[in-house]
Amino acid sequence: MFAHSIRRHPNSCSCGLVTSIILLLFAVAGNAFAHGVTFKFQHAQAADSALSTQFLDPWAKKIHDDSRGRVSLLITPQDQHATGTELFQVVLERTADIVWLDLQQPAVSFPIFGVFGLPLAGTTAEGSSRALWTWTDINDLGFREFKELRVLAAARHDTPVFHMREKAVSSLSDLKGARIAIPTADAETFLTGLGASPVVISGIAMRDALAQSSVDGALLSWSGLAALELEELVKAHSSAPVGAPWAYAELSVLLMNPDAYRSLADDLKQVVRNYSGSDVSAWIGKSIDETASDARKRAADRGDTFTTLPESDLDKWREAASVAINKRVADLDARGLHGEELITRARALIEQYDTAN
């Protein structure tokens, strides 16, 4: 539909009716191209969220500007209760052309992509997101796991922290029986191994759970705490022992319907490619890191309590991580995916790209 304008040959008008019809069709196509294309871009982020203002909106503007106004992204935020599964269906059916997904259960629907949600090492969302993009690319996950959708970028968020309503977690013994909310079942095995009682609920439902004291706290990234507007509901924040792997990682992905991409002229496809990939994933990760830093500063300004679990808890933390990883390896093996090899390769990429680690 969006073809290049056609320069007509001087003798073309002397042809018959068929030629006239073809020329009319080219003229219509050329007119559509001249006016550009508008793609619908959906996500479940609040319009004033850090991710919206620091990445989603600027990214859409860059595509518009670099295409000289020929590609516009109409941002239509979904209800914040919309799940990743619902948004995935939206882009598959092309109700929207581009979507940003926060994945609740990547291990179930996207098992290879979900390896990066395991309790592996990491330091920054910026480096980890660059590693995740590379992982997605070299494993051809757009085709293999995202049903041939075009993966534009991927993000591994900052490390989760225990955010507690009242009392800080000073040692792992404090977690015994504690009801800890998590946004993904991927962390359930790990938390159980620490002695806690995990409560798997959507991120948006955590507000009510914390406000109504139905959970004692949440294991969530700082950026997630800010995005879900939970900061005023918790008073104490406890980090993993020094040298410990992350408890898990929240994963997100930016997807485009392939028919929408194919509808573009070649030069406009290049614009989309220019704003896809490793650097864009790192851009997302950097904005996540900055959001996390700002959230920690606000907590300090409120006078919240900060603790780091002691070195004596490191072995138990690592043991819980190993149990969670081994369980996933068994699941991957059952799918014929060579789990141990995948874990080894994922670790190598994180070490390569998360250079601060």
Stretch-by-stretch model annotation:
Residues 35-127, 144-146, 150-357:
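N-terminal secretory/targeting leader peptides
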Residues 1-15:
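N-terminal secretory signal peptides that target proteins for export/translocation
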